[in-house]
Amino acid sequence: MGALTIVAKYMIVAQIEVNGSVDKSDIIGALFSQTEGLLGKDMDLRELQMMGRIGRIEVDIFEKNGKTKAKIYIPSNLDRYETALVAALVESIERVGPYPASVKVIEIRDLREEKRKKIIEKAKELVKLIEEEILPDTKEIIERLKEDVAKAEVVEYGPERLPAGPDVDKSDAIIIVEGRADVVNLVKHGYRNVIALEGISRGVPQTIIDLSKKKNVTVFIDGDKGGELVLKELLKVAHVDYIARAPPGKEVEQLTAKEIAKALRNKISLEEWLAQQKASGERAEAPPQPAQQPQQEQPAPQRPIQAPFDLEKKIEEMLGTLEAEIYDQNWTLVKRLPVRELPDFLATSGDSIYAIILDGITTQRIVDLAAKKGVKVIITARTGPLTKVPEDMSIYTFEQLKKTE
């Protein structure tokens, strides 16, 4: 069993049987894709993982006679009712890739049992202490507890000693906020994978830049002009996946638990944010290349793409849709989907992919995922900062193709 990624209350242990040969990523992909939306956004596995309410899903897999069996481990920081719902949700999986599958929850372990025993023993000692010692003032105790909890929960992260929640390293996704007060508020309401910029007057901390390269990043900004300025500075040097915003006129540190949850549920992708900026009449530019990494320029197309349809008409059809189309080697349409779902599709799909046309921004993350799938052609509205493009992959912008028609 793999290491836990959160301080969990429960461990869901399930067994899956697949009538075919699959790997771990196929099983995990099926868990996310087939349960999405079944119980609403509050119980969506991706949302729960982003908030640190469930941990990294681990799979122990073994194959025999062309069939695959595996054990699935899901650490949960939810209450027992919500944990039971997640377990039942997992049992709803019916396929992995093209193969029929069945899932059975074996057990739900209470990981806090040992801790309870220790607490009871300690409580017995403290009862004796209370009887023997004069109790201090109640208000003083409460103030001490508040101070100790605050100090224990918010840690200093990286060489810049940035304020952060305790689960930044453990979680696959992080929430970036502006200041320490924002971190304290989010940690207080259960979001432990949060870290602060601590202002941008001296530039974006290198720790934030490094974290953005290896984790899924949501930037949570204040609902004022200052929040937008912070975001634009961050986009110059860091990779951002999603943007969440406090209600107009409010700061993140002022939000209630309900307001925080709503803002994070309503987060949008970077591509959607740029499209909104453009639609509202603001000049929205793609994030420029970080200074420490020279940007690789895309050459203009040297030869026309041999597609069996009019590319210029296709581009006109795609403009404004914020969607992507996936094609195989014969330029047969495999799938059409929102651009925000493209990274997950590339990471989990078993389809053969030759070309992608998308009304959005092609980021380095999309290029990396596409390269793993053997994609040869990407036609995109715009490109973000690209530092590494495979030699056998061609990337064309809509403008480039219009010029060559």
UniProtKB/Swiss-Prot annotation:
Gene Ontology terms: biological process: DNA replication, synthesis of primer
Domain Toprim: 172-248
Name this polypeptide is given: DNA primase DnaG
Cofactor(s), names only, from the UniProt record: Mg(2+)
Organism: Pyrobaculum arsenaticum (strain DSM 13514 / JCM 11321 / PZ6)
Functional note: RNA polymerase that catalyzes the synthesis of short RNA molecules used as primers for DNA polymerase during DNA replication. Also part of the exosome, which is a complex involved in RNA degradation. Acts as a poly(A)-binding protein that enhances the interaction between heteromeric, adenine-rich transcripts and the exosome.
Stated family: Belongs to the archaeal DnaG primase family.
Region (Disordered): 279-303
Disulphide bridges: none
Annotated Gene Ontology cellular component terms: cytoplasm; DNA-directed RNA polymerase complex; exosome (RNase complex); primosome complex
Binding site for Mg(2+) 2: 222, 224
Gene3D superfamilies named among the record's database cross-references: 3.40.1360.10
Subunit annotation: Forms a ternary complex with MCM helicase and DNA. Component of the archaeal exosome complex.
Reactions catalysed: ssDNA + n NTP = ssDNA/pppN(pN)n-1 hybrid + (n-1) diphosphate
Keyword line: DNA replication, DNA-directed RNA polymerase, Exosome, Magnesium, Metal-binding, Nucleotidyltransferase, Primosome, Transcription, Transferase
UniProt cross-references to Pfam families, sorted A to Z: Toprim_4
